[in-house]
């Protein structure tokens, strides 16, 4: 239980034996920078409350075995780019987003995302933004119809 924590900075950094994370009570956590960085054996995360976090940099960087995050990620309060959060999550398929994403987000290192995961991401993007980019990469772009891509571009996002 992490209810009294406000920071989980590097909490599981480099825990290469970690394979599964079950429900984490992280209601008061605002800093999840590098929390699972380098957890190369981590395959699944069930339940991770992210609604209060302000920093998610490098959060899942190097989680090369991660394929499913079953609880919706809420990045509504994140203040910095979500550009390195999912770096090298090459087999991540299933992830859901809730809340509103107001900062640049890069998922281009996750080419195996399902269409449902991609649509969840696009639907969570804030409306009426300028100079914001959502990078999902050419492999993921090819999975989407023009109408689906317009979910992001009609809100003012650059989709790459």
Regions found by a protein language model. Name each.
Residues 1-160:
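Negatively charged
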């Amino acid at each position: 239980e992490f209810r009294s924590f406000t920071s989980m900075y590097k909490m599981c950094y480099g825990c290469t034996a970690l394979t599964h994370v079950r429900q984490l009570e992280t209601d008061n956590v605002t800093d999840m920078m590098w929390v699972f960085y380098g957890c190369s054996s981590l395959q699944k995360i069930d339940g991770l409350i992210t609604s209060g976090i302000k920093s998610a940099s490098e959060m899942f960087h190097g989680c090369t075995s991660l394929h499913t995050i079953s609880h919706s990620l809420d990045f509504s309060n994140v203040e910095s780019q979500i550009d390195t959060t999912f770096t090298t999550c090459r087999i991540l398929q299933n992830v859901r987003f809730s809340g509103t994403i107001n900062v640049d987000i890069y998922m281009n290192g996750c080419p195996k995302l399902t269409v449902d995961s991609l649509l969840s991401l696009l639907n969570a993007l804030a409306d009426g933004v300028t100079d914001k980019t959502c990078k999902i990469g050419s492999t993921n772009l090819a999975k989407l119809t023009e109408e689906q891509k317009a979910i992001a571009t009609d809100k003012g996002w650059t989709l790459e």
